[in-house]
Amino acid sequence: MHRGSLSRGQHVRGTRRRGAALAALAALLVATAPAQAAGSGALRGAGSNRCLDVLGGSQDDGALLQLYDCWGGTNQQWTSTDTGRLTVYGDKCLDVPGHATAPGTRVQIWSCSGGRNQQWRVNSDGTVVGVESGLCLEAAGAGTPNGTAVQLWTCNGGGNQKWTGLTGTPPTDGTCALPSTYRWSSTGVLAQPKSGWVALKDFTTVTHNGRHLVYGSTSSGSSYGSMVFSPFTNWSDMASAGQNAMNQAAVAPTLFYFAPKNIWVLAYQWGSWPFIYRTSSDPTDPNGWSAPQPLFTGSISGSDTGPIDQTLIADGQNMYLFFAGDNGKIYRASMPIGNFPGNFGSSYTTIMSDTKANLFEGVQVYKVQGQNQYLMIVEAMGANGRYFRSFTASSLSGSWTPQAASEGNPFAGKANSGATWTNDISHGDLVRDNPDQTMTVDPCNLQFLYQGKAPNAGGHYNSLPWRPGVLTLRH
């Protein structure tokens, strides 16, 4: 982010409840296909005319699913979220126990965790397929009576594997390659800043307990601050989500779950050190983070801002820090993963050099799911506004190859965003179902939370009215 001159500143019959679970699953599967509008309702077995139901109306983790007469109970009311989950009771997800991939595994409900064992796809042929297992949701033994178990099984086209109630999407094998040319559709403005703020910007987002958790920077026009949205289920809910200020600024943040230490990390800029981190066991609490610690203490030359816009990512051995300098360069530092969270020190490597406009800021790095590939995006300044260029690499320590790297053929920009409310596609984050340090994104279902502004908005950078929007990749 360009800082300008800002200071740093119950009816509980078991069978009925199981019916509810099935309905939820279908909705979730729709959401894991290329992003679609969220929906709620029941999922009905085509061969049985009975609904997916949580046994006994239980809301406990591990409660099993069954077929039962459709009756409209809450244990048969499922919500398909645009994060690829099928939820019931608001905070429970349709779940495959222990990430199992064997036919005959019974499905259950569990607290939403962001795992791939809670991702589903509803296909146009009526099947509901687990993304992680590739198996179909079915009524066991082609049963139709109340109480029939619901399980995973090899997809075979049987009527006990067909469900109705939701619109399907064309089947896929669950893996995709990055496109060479990106085409997006865009939401409109998703939220307005609350009183006292002129901008919402610099977003970082994860999926936490089945909901979007978004941190960002704020601007009052004269100083920067930081905030978090109260968790919400669908992007259309962002406008009504609470906007909660942090009592200690964390500008241009990066949020992720560091699985090796079972801790959440929030990294940011501007404070006692160029880059700082804090940790927490509850990322939804904006003021529950630990005391600041140094993340990086080095300096760079030829930059008016100094180190800016950090991002973090890990492979199996090392944690990597990437950052920009508003000066046409991208930098990298690393440490053994066992030493993290910790201080990268002052050493770094310059890994990319170009003009200031071509490599400006907003660098982000991701692992491409299902591929031996990493994706880097960097914000650039173009004739028609801010846009993102993309690069790929086979390792985080290797060299980066331009992919969609021009204003005419960008990763995301005016040329391909589909947005009508903004020409600028600026500082943001790809949506990740897995919130951990691998920064894994699904190329089958790419979404990009970005900041934009009205084309006629002008004035000092610090007063520009940045707002959130989301791009969805078109296939």
Curated annotation (Swiss-Prot):
pH-activity dependence text: Optimum pH is 6.
Main location: secreted
Pfam families membership: Glyco_hydro_62, Ricin_B_lectin
ATP-binding as UniProt keyword: no
GO cellular component: extracellular region
Highest taxon of the lineage: Bacteria
Thermal behavior of activity: Optimum temperature is 55 degrees Celsius.
Keywords associated with the record: Carbohydrate metabolism, Glycosidase, Hydrolase, Lectin, Polysaccharide degradation, Secreted, Signal, Xylan degradation
Pathway(s) this gene product operates in, as recorded in its UniProt entry: Glycan degradation; xylan degradation
Assigned EC number: 3.2.1.55
Note: These dual activities might be explained by a rotation about the alpha-(1->3)-glycosidic bond of the arabinofuranose group to the xylose moiety of xylan, which produces a bond conformation resembling that of a beta-(1->4) bond found in xylosides. Thus a single catalytic site could perform the double activity.
Function summary: Involved in the degradation of xylan and is a key enzyme in the complete degradation of the plant cell wall. It has a specific arabinofuranose-debranching activity on xylan from gramineae. Acts synergistically with the xylanases and binds specifically to xylan. From small arabinoxylo-oligosides (ranging from arabinoxylotriose to arabinoxylohexaose), it liberates arabinose and, after prolonged incubation, the purified enzyme exhibits some xylanolytic activity as well.
Protein name: Extracellular exo-alpha-L-arabinofuranosidase
Gene expressing this chain: abfB
